[in-house]
Each structure stands twice: as structure tokens, then as C-alpha cells.
Amino acid sequence: MIVVTGAAGFIGSNLVRGLNRRGIYDIIAIDDLTEGDKFRNLVDCRIADYMHHEDARALLKAGQFPRVRAVLHQGACSDTTERNGQYMMDNNYRVTLEWFEYCQANRVPLIYASSAAVYGASTVYVEDPANEGPLNVYGYSKLLFDQVLRTRMDKLTAQVVGLRYFNVYGPHEQHKGRMASVAFHNMNQFLAEGHVRLFSGWDGYADGGQSRDFISVEDVVDVNLHFLDHPGTSGIFNCGTGRAQPFNDVAAAVVNTLRAEQGEAPLSLDELVSQGLIRYIPFPDDLKGRYQSFTQANVDALRAAGYTAVMRDVQTGVSEYVRYWRSRKSLA
């Protein structure tokens, strides 16, 4: 059995699909379906069992959780604006620690979701404590377990890998609401209003020129499975493309892919702007000084760990995403 926590969530459900594509169906999916809507993310997946996350946690604490082949731990509170520190630390730090202790006691590989939020305002995205300084309790909840792993690295009984996800986009994120990716919101905006809105220039960047390391969830799944295939490798690794691209690229990919559906030719950025298909709104005063205008993962450690696949750029990945959702007609 392989455990996937957060299995009905965005990255978790895509991981289940990735395992299914390999013919792996003996999966224990752990999540919280109290509100129910996320079940849709698992409808087309094959799993062996579903378990509520609190039931799984009770078994962990009692030392009664069955031994499994591996744990892919994606379950967490991913709302970076959550201000309840106790809730965040319990869900993100403490639960990860409990899975870690279980996996070490039973010699089970653990691959868990960390976050690029650990870097805070740093402009150097290398997996080194000198570059880390989270700006919110979400980032701290992720950093604290990374620090635990560092102190235990020379005593591990089984693989432990922390993946610092950058800006992930792709299918099955619709339940995330305002925390969904820029690509998702751009799609909804264009379909509803016929144009996409981006922030105007600030902090030395042109209109829509603020940049992020946008990574397709398909590449995130591939990275997870790479480490699952290499249980002798442990450590903390950035999970990004190593390529920063502006928000303009995301918006252009969304609009041009949707235009192509109607048989319309692609437009350049200047043409998209001049025709009012991309519009810029004033940069919010309350974000000035608190906004990351640029992120770009250093992927040297990831490459050194043997992951050599070419990752999708925004033009490829976002277009795939748009076509997928339109084919499913599930964008709302």
C-alpha cells in the first residue's frame, strides 16, 4: 500500500492519478471530505481505501497504523493568509512530524510537501538556512519541519524528501477558491468578462512583468515519483522549473488557447493589450512592500539528485491546462 495524504486535494489527487497511470491502485487516500465537494477530484481515480485524516491520525498516535510501502504526504492547510497559528502549526508541522516518526519507526519512505514560502523575502532560492525567513505562519509551519529533518539527516532509517513547491498550477485546483493559481483565475476572468486583469508595474517591473517560477502539477507529480523510484535519496529540494516567467506570459497563454478554440489566430502581447484582452489595474497600496515580484527556484540540488526531465514552460503547461478543463467543461 501507498499512502497519499491530502488525496482529494489539488496535488494529492494528481499524485493518485500519477500512481494509477503506473498501474498502482493499492492506495490509501487520506483527506477530509466533511464539506464533500473535493470528492470530485477522486471520481476518476482508483484507490483501495479512503480514510478521514483524523482517523488516520488517531491510528498513528496509537501506534496502530498498518505498515505501508511509502507515504506521500500532501495534506496541509495551504491557505497562506490563515492567521490561526495554532491551527496551522498543528495541521502542517505536528501532523508531518507524526508521519515522520511513523515512517522512521517502520522504515517507510516519506515524501512530503514543503513550500517556497520558507524563503520569504529572500531573493536567493537555494536550499540553505541563510536564505530562509518566512513572512507568515504558513511558511514557518513548513520551515520548522524542514529544520527537524536537517537535524535528523544523519540518523534516518528510511528515505525522507521535502519538496519546496513553487507556484503550482493545473487540473483539480478549483476547490481552492482564491488560493487557486493565476492561470485558473485568468481562465475564469476571460470566460466571464472577455478580458484578463493583471497588476500594473511596480518595484521596477513593467505592467504584468512581475515574475514567478510557475510549475505544472504534472511536473510536480513527476518529481514526486522520481524520488519514490530512488529510495536511497533524502534531503530538501526545490520543486520549480528554474525558470521565472512574467504574469503576462500566463495571461497570454490562457487567452490565446481560448481564442484557438474559436479558430482565432494567436496574438502578441502588444496586440492582446491594444485590443483590451489583457488589462492592467493599479498595483494595490496594501501589497507594496509585502509582495514578491520575482521568484525562481534554483534546481541544482534537484538535478544533482538525478531528476533530468525537461519541465514545461508556461506556454506549454498553461495551454495544456486550459485545453484539459475546456474538454471537461468543468471550469466554474
Curated annotation (Swiss-Prot):
Which InterPro entries does the annotation name? Epimerase_deHydtase, Heptose_epim, NAD(P)-bd_dom_sf
Q: Which residues bind NADP(+)?
A: 10-11, 31-32, 38, 74-78, 91, 142, 168, 176
Q: Which residues are listed for substrate binding in this entry?
A: 167, 178, 185, 199-202, 212, 291
Which species does this protein come from? Bordetella avium (strain 197N)
**What does the UniProt cofactor note say?**
Binds 1 NADP(+) per subunit.
This chain belongs to the protein called ADP-L-glycero-D-manno-heptose-6-epimerase
List UniProt keywords, sorted A-Z.
Answer: Carbohydrate metabolism, Isomerase, NADP
**Annotated Pfam families:** Epimerase (PF01370)
Subunit architecture: Homopentamer.
The yes or no answer to whether the keyword NADP is present is yes
